[in-house]
Design a protein with these regions (language model features):
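Alpha-helical bundle regulatory/interaction domains
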Residues: 2-23, 31-44, 48-50, 96-180
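Catalytic grooves of carbohydrate-active enzymes
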Residues: 27
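Conserved hydrophobic/aromatic beta-strand scaffold that supports enzyme active sites
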Residues: 57, 65-67, 86-87, 111-113, ...
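Residues in flexible loops and secondary-structure boundaries
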Residues: 63, 68, 73-76, 122, ...
Length: 180
């Protein structure tokens, strides 16, 4: 499992790159988050819950590293991404993502990988705070072409559930690289 200290170091470091804090207006939060990812529908679950959203965002060449929490249970839905995929790792709480190949329950030991061609519906628990890595599709295609030695004709697709437990060193290495 990814070390808690590494995640803590990464999230503390990302605090230097706030996009917004204490967002409580649904339309404003949806607009700001949609500017980083894609336009989407956002609905707060339960009449007694209110948003207290925050997001940190660091844009790199072909990726971005983000933390996002809504402070309330929310439903989110959007059309397929065309230019990127997302690795979504809850640092606290649980998120259920309904994608093309079923439902992924993401939590600290299982990240959700959202492919570029999947329509998306998510339910975030009220205490769900996530590390979200956005990777441009062109970078993935170039990397695969380099590794395979020939052009990739179709979208590269990955399994939607990434087990972050011991033994899956590749995924941990990617997160570790970003965390250090």
């Amino acid at each position: 499992m990814l070390k808690t200290k590494e995640l803590s170091n990464l999230t503390e470091w990302l605090d230097k790159y706030p996009l917004f804090h204490s967002g409580d207006e649904v339309d404003e939060v949806r607009h700001k988050v949609g500017g980083i990812f894609v336009p989407h529908h956002l609905r707060v679950l339960g009449q007694q819950q209110h948003l207290s959203a925050n997001m940190n965002h660091l844009q790199l060449d072909n990726t971005s590293v983000n933390t996002l929490g809504y402070g309330a249970g929310v439903n989110i839905s959007c059309d397929p991404f065309e230019q990127f995929l997302l690795i979504m790792l809850p640092m606290t709480g649980v998120m259920h993502a309904t994608v093309e190949d079923g439902v992924v329950e993401a939590h600290k030991n299982v990240a959700a990988l959202i492919n570029t061609s999947d329509p998306l519906s998510m339910k975030w628990g009220e205490n769900c705070n996530q590390l979200i890595i956005r990777i441009n599709k062109a970078l993935i295609a170039r990397t695969c072409e380099t590794l395979l030695g020939h052009p990739v004709k179709d979208d590269v697709k990955f399994s939607s559930a990434l087990q972050m437990a011991q033994g899956n060193d590749m995924y941990q290495s990617i997160i570790h690289l970003l965390a250090t």
